[in-house]
Amino acid sequence: MKYMTVTDLNDAGATVIGTIKGGEWFLGTPHKDILSKPGFYFLVSKLGGPFSNPCVSARFYVGNQRSKQGFSAVLSHIRQRRSQLARTIANNNVPYTVFYLPASKMKPLTTGFGKGQLALAFTRNHHSEYQTLEEMNRMLADNFKFVLQAY
C-alpha cells in the first residue's frame, strides 16, 4: 500500500482552498460557500514526503449539513483537540495545505484506483444513493496510507 500524494490529488482534480496551521486559517480564510461544500478535504504538509510530491497527512469528509458548517466544523474539532489526530494537528505548529475534492471526482482514488485510463472509463461512478461518504472514506483507507491517520 502506498501513501497518497499530491500527484494523486491533482490527477483526481482536487483544488487547493487554503492553508491551515493549528486549526486556524493561515494566509487568508476561504469563503464560507467553499468551506460548506460536501466532499473530501485533504491536509498536505511539505514535511510529509519529498518536496516535489509530498504525501497527504490526513483526510476528512463533510456531508450535507443543515448548519452548513462544513470544513469549519472540522477545524473547530482540531482547535478543541477532540481526538489524537486533532491534538497532533493543533500542537505540531506545521502548516497544512488544504485540498478539496467533491465526491463526484473520487472514482480515480476509490473504485478506479490502480486501473489504466481505459479500465477507469468503464469503472462505475459513485451515484448510488446508498454509496455514502463513509464508504468512500473506507475505500481510501483500503487503497492508501496517510501520514497521521492509521485508518
UniProtKB/Swiss-Prot annotation:
One of its GO terms (molecular function) is DNA binding. Keywords: DNA-binding, Host-virus interaction, Inhibition of host DNA replication by virus, Modulation of host cell cycle by virus. The keyword DNA-binding applies. The keyword Lipid biosynthesis does not apply. GO terms for biological process: symbiont-mediated perturbation of host cell cycle progression; symbiont-mediated suppression of host DNA replication. Disorganizes the host nucleoid and inhibits replication, but without host DNA cleavage or degradation. Only the architecture of the nucleoid is affected. May act on the host chromosomal sequences that determine the structure of the nucleoid. Binds to dsDNA but not to ssDNA. This is Nucleoid disruption protein. It comes from Enterobacteria phage T4 (Bacteriophage T4).
